[in-house]
Protein backbone atom coordinates (compact mmCIF):
# COMPACT_ATOMS: atom_id res chain seq x y z
CA UNK A 1 0.00 0.00 0.00
CA UNK A 2 2.75 2.46 0.93
CA UNK A 3 4.47 1.74 -2.38
CA UNK A 4 1.33 2.79 -4.29
CA UNK A 5 0.18 5.76 -2.20
CA UNK A 6 2.13 8.60 -0.63
CA UNK A 7 -0.53 9.30 1.96
CA UNK A 8 1.31 12.15 3.65
CA UNK A 9 1.68 14.00 0.35
CA UNK A 10 -2.00 13.43 -0.39
CA UNK A 11 -2.91 14.83 3.03
CA UNK A 12 -0.67 17.87 2.95
CA UNK A 13 -1.72 18.79 -0.60
CA UNK A 14 -5.39 18.38 0.38
CA UNK A 15 -5.89 15.60 -2.14
CA UNK A 16 -6.97 13.25 0.66
CA UNK A 17 -10.61 13.24 -0.44
CA UNK A 18 -13.49 10.80 -0.18
CA UNK A 19 -12.72 9.45 -3.66
CA UNK A 20 -9.09 8.79 -2.77
CA UNK A 21 -10.08 7.35 0.61
CA UNK A 22 -12.46 4.95 -1.11
CA UNK A 23 -9.72 3.86 -3.50
CA UNK A 24 -7.27 3.25 -0.65
CA UNK A 25 -9.85 1.30 1.38
CA UNK A 26 -10.58 -1.00 -1.54
CA UNK A 27 -6.86 -1.66 -1.90
CA UNK A 28 -6.65 -2.32 1.86
CA UNK A 29 -9.33 -5.04 2.06
CA UNK A 30 -8.09 -8.60 1.63
CA UNK A 31 -9.14 -12.22 1.51
CA UNK A 32 -5.71 -13.52 2.45
CA UNK A 33 -6.35 -17.27 2.09
CA UNK A 34 -8.79 -17.38 -0.81
CA UNK A 35 -11.71 -18.82 1.15
CA UNK A 36 -14.11 -16.10 0.03
CA UNK A 37 -14.15 -14.36 3.40
CA UNK A 38 -12.52 -11.02 4.17
CA UNK A 39 -9.63 -11.36 6.61
CA UNK A 40 -8.39 -7.75 6.67
CA UNK A 41 -10.96 -4.96 6.42
CA UNK A 42 -10.23 -1.53 5.04
CA UNK A 43 -11.90 0.30 7.91
CA UNK A 44 -13.22 -0.21 11.42
CA UNK A 45 -14.69 2.40 13.73
CA UNK A 46 -14.66 3.19 17.41
CA UNK A 47 -17.82 1.84 18.99
CA UNK A 48 -20.65 0.94 16.66
CA UNK A 49 -18.99 1.45 13.32
CA UNK A 50 -22.02 2.87 11.54
CA UNK A 51 -22.34 5.59 14.16
CA UNK A 52 -18.78 6.82 14.60
CA UNK A 53 -17.68 6.53 10.98
CA UNK A 54 -20.84 8.23 9.75
CA UNK A 55 -20.43 11.09 12.23
CA UNK A 56 -16.77 11.54 11.33
CA UNK A 57 -17.49 11.62 7.60
CA UNK A 58 -20.35 14.03 8.25
CA UNK A 59 -18.03 16.46 10.02
CA UNK A 60 -15.54 16.10 7.17
CA UNK A 61 -18.29 16.88 4.65
CA UNK A 62 -19.58 19.97 6.46
CA UNK A 63 -22.82 18.05 6.87
CA UNK A 64 -24.30 18.81 10.29
CA UNK A 65 -27.55 17.19 11.34
CA UNK A 66 -28.85 20.43 12.91
CA UNK A 67 -28.71 24.16 12.33
CA UNK A 68 -29.58 27.05 14.62
CA UNK A 69 -32.39 29.12 13.10
CA UNK A 70 -33.80 32.10 14.95
CA UNK A 71 -34.89 31.02 18.41
CA UNK A 72 -34.84 27.34 17.58
CA UNK A 73 -33.05 24.47 15.88
CA UNK A 74 -33.86 22.91 12.54
CA UNK A 75 -33.07 19.26 11.82
CA UNK A 76 -31.34 19.30 8.41
CA UNK A 77 -30.57 15.62 7.90
CA UNK A 78 -32.74 15.77 4.77
CA UNK A 79 -30.39 18.23 3.06
CA UNK A 80 -27.95 17.05 0.41
CA UNK A 81 -24.66 17.07 2.41
CA UNK A 82 -26.05 14.77 5.11
CA UNK A 83 -27.78 12.45 2.64
CA UNK A 84 -24.57 12.31 0.57
CA UNK A 85 -22.68 11.23 3.69
CA UNK A 86 -25.11 8.37 4.31
CA UNK A 87 -24.94 7.39 0.65
CA UNK A 88 -21.15 7.25 0.85
CA UNK A 89 -21.40 4.97 3.88
CA UNK A 90 -23.73 2.67 1.95
CA UNK A 91 -21.25 2.59 -0.93
CA UNK A 92 -18.32 1.70 1.32
CA UNK A 93 -20.35 -0.95 3.15
CA UNK A 94 -22.37 -2.68 0.46
CA UNK A 95 -20.79 -1.88 -2.90
CA UNK A 96 -17.11 -1.84 -1.95
CA UNK A 97 -17.49 -4.09 1.12
CA UNK A 98 -14.60 -2.46 2.97
CA UNK A 99 -16.45 -2.11 6.32
CA UNK A 100 -17.42 -5.24 8.21
CA UNK A 101 -21.12 -5.93 8.66
CA UNK A 102 -20.52 -9.16 10.57
CA UNK A 103 -20.24 -7.66 14.04
CA UNK A 104 -22.00 -4.91 15.95
CA UNK A 105 -18.72 -3.85 17.45
CA UNK A 106 -18.35 -2.35 20.84
CA UNK A 107 -15.65 0.28 21.15
CA UNK A 108 -13.10 -2.23 22.39
CA UNK A 109 -13.94 -4.79 19.69
CA UNK A 110 -13.36 -2.51 16.73
CA UNK A 111 -10.26 -1.09 18.35
CA UNK A 112 -8.93 -4.59 18.95
CA UNK A 113 -9.61 -5.50 15.32
CA UNK A 114 -7.44 -2.59 14.19
CA UNK A 115 -4.75 -3.11 16.81
CA UNK A 116 -4.34 -6.78 15.88
CA UNK A 117 -4.06 -6.04 12.17
CA UNK A 118 -7.63 -6.97 11.24
CA UNK A 119 -8.32 -3.59 9.66
CA UNK A 120 -6.01 -1.19 7.89
CA UNK A 121 -7.70 2.00 9.09
CA UNK A 122 -9.62 2.94 12.21
CA UNK A 123 -11.56 6.10 12.97
CA UNK A 124 -11.50 7.17 16.58
CA UNK A 125 -10.43 9.75 19.14
CA UNK A 126 -7.25 10.49 21.01
CA UNK A 127 -8.25 9.08 24.38
CA UNK A 128 -7.87 5.57 22.93
CA UNK A 129 -4.18 6.12 22.23
CA UNK A 130 -3.09 4.88 25.64
CA UNK A 131 -5.22 1.76 25.16
CA UNK A 132 -3.53 1.03 21.85
CA UNK A 133 -0.12 1.25 23.52
CA UNK A 134 -1.05 -1.39 26.10
CA UNK A 135 -2.67 -3.79 23.63
CA UNK A 136 -0.02 -4.32 20.99
CA UNK A 137 3.73 -4.75 21.30
CA UNK A 138 6.08 -2.92 18.95
CA UNK A 139 3.38 -0.81 17.33
CA UNK A 140 3.15 2.72 16.08
CA UNK A 141 0.54 4.17 13.77
CA UNK A 142 0.10 6.99 11.32
CA UNK A 143 -2.33 9.84 11.94
CA UNK A 144 -4.39 11.14 9.05
CA UNK A 145 -7.34 13.53 8.89
CA UNK A 146 -10.75 12.16 8.07
CA UNK A 147 -10.79 12.76 4.29
CA UNK A 148 -12.27 15.91 2.78
CA UNK A 149 -15.90 15.52 1.75
CA UNK A 150 -17.34 17.02 -1.45
CA UNK A 151 -19.24 19.69 0.52
CA UNK A 152 -16.28 20.83 2.61
CA UNK A 153 -14.85 23.39 0.20
CA UNK A 154 -11.57 21.53 -0.19
CA UNK A 155 -10.60 21.92 3.49
CA UNK A 156 -10.21 19.58 6.45
CA UNK A 157 -12.50 20.09 9.41
CA UNK A 158 -12.00 19.53 13.12
CA UNK A 159 -15.29 19.47 15.04
CA UNK A 160 -13.74 19.80 18.50
CA UNK A 161 -10.15 19.34 19.74
CA UNK A 162 -9.12 15.68 19.44
CA UNK A 163 -12.32 14.70 17.68
CA UNK A 164 -12.49 11.90 15.12
CA UNK A 165 -9.43 11.36 12.97
CA UNK A 166 -8.29 8.41 10.91
CA UNK A 167 -5.57 6.26 12.42
CA UNK A 168 -3.99 3.86 9.99
CA UNK A 169 -1.36 1.31 9.13
CA UNK A 170 0.29 -0.26 12.17
CA UNK A 171 4.07 -0.65 11.80
CA UNK A 172 7.00 -1.58 14.01
CA UNK A 173 8.63 0.78 16.46
CA UNK A 174 11.54 0.25 18.82
CA UNK A 175 10.00 2.61 21.38
CA UNK A 176 6.52 1.17 21.75
CA UNK A 177 5.79 2.91 25.05
CA UNK A 178 6.04 6.32 23.37
CA UNK A 179 4.17 5.40 20.19
CA UNK A 180 1.09 7.50 19.54
CA UNK A 181 1.56 9.99 22.36
CA UNK A 182 2.38 12.73 19.87
CA UNK A 183 -1.25 12.82 18.82
CA UNK A 184 -2.45 13.30 22.38
CA UNK A 185 0.07 16.05 23.00
CA UNK A 186 -0.67 18.14 19.93
CA UNK A 187 -4.44 17.85 20.01
CA UNK A 188 -4.65 18.62 23.74
CA UNK A 189 -2.13 21.44 23.89
CA UNK A 190 -2.27 22.92 20.36
CA UNK A 191 1.28 24.37 20.48
CA UNK A 192 1.94 27.12 17.97
CA UNK A 193 5.72 26.82 17.78
CA UNK A 194 6.90 24.10 20.11
CA UNK A 195 9.88 22.83 18.17
CA UNK A 196 11.67 21.54 21.25
CA UNK A 197 8.86 19.17 22.16
CA UNK A 198 8.44 18.16 18.55
CA UNK A 199 12.13 17.30 18.32
CA UNK A 200 11.86 15.06 21.36
CA UNK A 201 9.00 13.15 19.73
CA UNK A 202 10.96 12.82 16.51
CA UNK A 203 13.64 10.95 18.42
CA UNK A 204 11.14 8.57 19.98
CA UNK A 205 8.50 7.82 17.34
CA UNK A 206 9.14 5.80 14.21
CA UNK A 207 6.39 7.37 12.11
CA UNK A 208 7.75 10.91 12.21
CA UNK A 209 5.77 12.02 9.15
CA UNK A 210 2.66 12.07 11.30
CA UNK A 211 4.11 15.01 13.23
CA UNK A 212 3.50 17.32 10.26
CA UNK A 213 -0.06 16.08 9.91
CA UNK A 214 -0.81 16.39 13.63
CA UNK A 215 0.59 19.90 13.80
CA UNK A 216 -1.50 20.91 10.80
CA UNK A 217 -4.65 19.45 12.38
CA UNK A 218 -4.04 21.19 15.70
CA UNK A 219 -4.19 24.60 14.03
CA UNK A 220 -7.43 24.15 12.13
CA UNK A 221 -10.48 26.13 13.29
CA UNK A 222 -13.11 24.12 15.14
CA UNK A 223 -16.59 23.74 13.67
CA UNK A 224 -18.45 22.80 16.86
CA UNK A 225 -21.74 24.57 17.56
CA UNK A 226 -24.41 24.20 20.22
CA UNK A 227 -27.37 23.36 17.99
CA UNK A 228 -27.50 19.58 18.53
CA UNK A 229 -30.41 18.93 20.94
CA UNK A 230 -29.67 16.87 24.02
CA UNK A 231 -32.78 14.73 23.73
CA UNK A 232 -33.42 11.01 23.96
CA UNK A 233 -34.54 10.58 20.35
CA UNK A 234 -31.69 12.63 18.89
CA UNK A 235 -29.11 10.74 20.94
CA UNK A 236 -30.59 7.40 19.90
CA UNK A 237 -30.48 8.32 16.21
CA UNK A 238 -27.04 9.94 16.25
CA UNK A 239 -25.52 6.97 18.10
CA UNK A 240 -27.40 4.44 15.99
CA UNK A 241 -26.66 2.60 12.77
CA UNK A 242 -28.42 5.02 10.39
CA UNK A 243 -30.24 2.18 8.63
CA UNK A 244 -27.02 0.96 7.03
CA UNK A 245 -27.05 -2.73 8.14
CA UNK A 246 -30.60 -3.06 6.77
CA UNK A 247 -29.66 -1.28 3.52
CA UNK A 248 -32.35 1.31 4.14
CA UNK A 249 -31.97 4.07 1.51
CA UNK A 250 -30.67 7.29 3.12
CA UNK A 251 -33.72 9.38 2.19
CA UNK A 252 -36.04 6.69 3.56
CA UNK A 253 -34.13 6.46 6.83
CA UNK A 254 -34.08 10.23 7.31
CA UNK A 255 -37.80 10.51 6.51
CA UNK A 256 -38.53 7.89 9.18
CA UNK A 257 -36.90 9.92 11.97
CA UNK A 258 -37.09 13.55 10.84
CA UNK A 259 -40.51 14.52 12.21
CA UNK A 260 -39.93 13.02 15.65
CA UNK A 261 -36.51 14.64 15.90
CA UNK A 262 -37.89 18.04 14.92
CA UNK A 263 -40.84 17.77 17.30
CA UNK A 264 -38.56 16.92 20.20
CA UNK A 265 -36.16 19.73 19.32
CA UNK A 266 -39.05 22.22 19.08
CA UNK A 267 -40.33 21.17 22.48
CA UNK A 268 -36.87 21.54 24.01
CA UNK A 269 -36.36 25.02 22.63
CA UNK A 270 -39.85 26.11 23.64
CA UNK A 271 -38.81 25.50 27.24
CA UNK A 272 -35.60 27.50 26.92
CA UNK A 273 -35.36 30.90 28.58
CA UNK A 274 -34.14 33.13 25.76
CA UNK A 275 -34.67 36.42 27.59
Where are these regions (language model features)?
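Glycine-centered hinge/linker elements that transmit conformational signals in sensory
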Residues: 18, 22-27, 64-104
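Conserved C-terminal helix/tail region of periplasmic/extracytoplasmic solute-binding proteins
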Residues: 171-180, 188-275
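Paired acidic/hydrophobic, glycine-rich loop segments that form the ligand-binding mouth/hinge
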Residues: 120-125, 142
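Extracytoplasmic/periplasmic substrate-recognition and gating elements
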Residues: 134-203
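Short helices/loops that flank or line small-molecule/ion binding pockets
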Residues: 22-27, 107-122
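Extracytoplasmic/periplasmic solute-binding protein
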Residues: 2, 14-74
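Short, solvent-exposed loop/beta-turn-alpha elements that line the ligand-binding surface or hinge
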Residues: 11-14, 41, 63-84, 149-158
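Aromatic-glycine-rich donor-binding/catalytic loop that engages nucleotide-sugar donors
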Residues: 1-11
